[in-house]
């Protein structure tokens, strides 16, 4: 996950029996054009590989993943442009160098909310916290609450600037608890279909993702049906 501060809250909110947190500092390396033999020269990538228990491999290979330590590998980043860029860089790493984990359905993107809506007790209903992924969800939530006769003064809206702003209970509820979190499974095209590879080459080749097109790269990949 992105950030040391958020990592501390996540470690407190996780289920220690089966969940582990690996905080990453800043943006990881764009590995699209990095030789596989040089990957472990990067500390973050080395730590990722060791943590999940799988060695890097080439697209199309079917390595032994019997030592895979976790059934779900979830990418957690802030719900902003920088966070989307980090997601793209990690997706690039997993697609190019750990592709079998994508093929077998082990890679997910965590979808933290942008907004929290709080309302007080009303009748038999206790006070509530409602999390909204985006402005569209926020609008629908506010409209629904007004139909329940909540006033503008009773509807308190907070915006999260990042994962680090959430306390451990909020992070647990929105991103860690299997009953309440939202995850987007990452899937790739059918074997032999090189459409995904061509798209990745356009977006990540020649260090494009490190320049002004990073926001575009994040948007295109997150909306590409190959990855959804």
Regions found by a protein language model. Name each.
Residues 1-228:
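Conserved phosphate-chemistry cores used by DNA topoisomerases
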């Amino acid at each position: 996950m992105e950030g040391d501060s958020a990592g501390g809250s996540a470690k407190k909110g996780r289920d220690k029996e089966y969940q582990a947190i690996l905080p990453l500092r800043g943006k990881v390396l764009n590995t699209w054009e990095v030789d596989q033999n040089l990957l472990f020269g990067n500390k973050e990538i080395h730590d990722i590989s060791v943590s999940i228990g799988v060695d890097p491999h080439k697209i199309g290979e079917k390595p032994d993943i019997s030592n895979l330590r976790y059934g779900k590998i979830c990418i957690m980043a802030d719900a902003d442009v920088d966070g989307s860029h980090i997601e793209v860089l990690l997706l690039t790493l997993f697609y190019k160098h750990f592709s079998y984990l994508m093929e077998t359905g082990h890679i997910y993107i965590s979808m933290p909310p942008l907004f929290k809506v709080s309302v007080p007790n009303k009748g038999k209903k206790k006070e509530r916290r409602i999390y909204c992924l985006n402005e569209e969800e926020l609008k629908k939530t506010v409209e629904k609450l007004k139909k329940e006769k909540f006033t503008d003064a009773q509807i308190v809206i907070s915006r999260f600037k990042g994962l680090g702003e959430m306390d451990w209970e909020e992070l647990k509820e929105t991103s860690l608890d299997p009953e309440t979190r939202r995850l987007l499974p990452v899937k790739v095209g059918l074997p032999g279909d090189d459409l995904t590879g061509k798209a990745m080459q356009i977006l990540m080749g020649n260090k494009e993702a490190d320049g002004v097109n990073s926001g575009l790269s994040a948007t295109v990949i997150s909306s590409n049906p190959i990855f959804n």
